Amino acid sequence: MKHQLNSVKKFHEVYKLNYSEKPITDIGLDTIKLRFNLMDEENKEYFEAAKNNDLIEVADALGDMLYILCGTIIEHGMQNKIEEIFDEIQRSNTVSYTHLTLPTIYSV
């Protein structure tokens, strides 16, 4: 994940886009709206691509989603914490689902 985050950070540096070296929440309402709208657009593109069984467009949407997510992570200055955050979510999810069987999970 560090490679992807560093690549997007370089993009932000070249194009004078914001990023933070420390965790922050206040990135400005305009940036929050932009990040939300970019992710929303890619989610919709993914939905259409998956619904239409278009593997190339699914891959494109997933790649764009990852790129936008990396940009959002570095805007919030969480690039040095995101793997730890992910690991904690993984641990929590694993504990949450240990009592469920696969048929139970997929019947929700």
Residue ranges and their predicted role:
Residues 107-108:
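N-terminal low-complexity segments that are often proline-rich with Ser/Thr-Pro
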Residues 39, 43, 55-83, 89:
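An amphipathic alpha-helical micro-motif enriched in hydrophobic residues
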Residues 98-104:
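Conserved small/polar residues in nucleotide/adenosyl-binding loops
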